[in-house]
């Protein structure tokens, strides 16, 4: 604890999911003690009123994402930065576009011991469709379908680096290059700083134009919100199975969390209720 004073009692509370996880860990520990003959029974399994500790929610947690207005200002900020300093910020613009349009995680843009993202991981199939190969969460390899707009973004980025319009098979050029030195970016912290710069510029513009609430909420945003935003927008008009596979979700149930049509309709039906 950083302060000289002791933490205030009651200043922190575990969430229901944290309590549930804690009970699971304790239950496993007590089962081990039973196997080693230290205990005869598992006290956690004897908690008949677990609902006393775990709050059940009627609805699922809301996905943290940018609003259409916030995204317009964020990508607009990246475009302005690229126009003012292309040597540095054409890369910034590409990063923002890739995180949003291909639902990439931050770890999928940087060089790691398990994967080195390269230009050659953009591939064209025999039908002329472009795909991006990546290795994501759980060390799972997946192909992401590449839209025409993302292909245009790729062409622009490559030309800013003095490369041909689209990559050839096996192109070893790093996907996200260092502006100083050679090779690809290896630090997720550097990507976070790049994205945060766009968020800060967008928040400044939003506040300047009177969108104070949107600017304040943008202050809470993280890099991962861009992935959530891209998925949330696409699931409105793409088959959820297609979005699921591009996002690398383990099941359609995860993708379903991004569909808020029923929630919007529910609120719309309540909007004009009268009290008196």
Language-model features: where?
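C-terminal catalytic core of Y-nucleophile DNA break-rejoin enzymes
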Residues: 136-156, 171-198
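DNA breakage-rejoining catalytic core of tyrosine-based enzymes
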Residues: 54-76, 139-149, 165-172
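Conserved tyrosine-mediated DNA breakage-rejoining catalytic core shared by Y-recombinases
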Residues: 111-156, 162
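Short, basic (Lys/Arg/His-rich) helix/loop patches that form interaction surfaces
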Residues: 83, 192-245, 252
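A short, glycine-centered helix-capping/turn motif at helix boundaries
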Residues: 27, 37, 98-112, 237-238, ...
């Amino acid at each position: 604890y950083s302060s000289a004073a002791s933490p205030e009692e009651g200043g922190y509370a575990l969430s229901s999911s944290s309590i549930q996880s804690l009970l699971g860990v304790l239950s496993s520990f007590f089962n081990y003690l039973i196997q080693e003959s230290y205990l005869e029974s598992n006290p956690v399994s004897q908690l008949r009123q677990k609902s006393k500790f775990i709050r059940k929610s009627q609805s699922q947690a809301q996905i943290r994402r940018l609003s259409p207005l916030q995204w317009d200002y964020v990508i607009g900020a990246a475009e302005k930065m690229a126009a003012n300093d292309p040597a540095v910020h054409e890369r910034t613009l590409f990063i923002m576009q890739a995180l949003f349009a291909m639902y990439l995680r931050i770890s999928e843009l940087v060089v790691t011991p398990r994967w080195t993202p390269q230009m050659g991981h953009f591939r064209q199939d025999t039908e002329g469709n472009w795909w991006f190969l990546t290795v994501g969460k759980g060390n799972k390899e997946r192909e992401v379908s590449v839209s025409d707009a993302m292909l245009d973004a790729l062409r622009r980025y490559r030309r800013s680096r003095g490369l041909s319009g689209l990559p050839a098979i096996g192109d070893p050029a790093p996907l996200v290059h260092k502006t100083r030195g050679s090779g690809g970016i290896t630090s997720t912290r550097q990507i976070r700083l790049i994205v945060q710069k766009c968020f800060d510029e967008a928040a400044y513009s939003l506040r300047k134009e009177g969108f104070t609430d949107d600017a304040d909420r943008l202050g809470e945003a993280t890099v991962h919100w861009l992935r959530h935003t891209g998925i949330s927008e696409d699931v409105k008009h793409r088959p959820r199975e297609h979005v699921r596979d591009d996002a690398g979700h383990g099941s359609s149930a995860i993708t379903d969390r991004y569909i808020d049509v029923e929630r919007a309709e529910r609120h719309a039906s309540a909007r004009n209720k009268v009290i008196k």
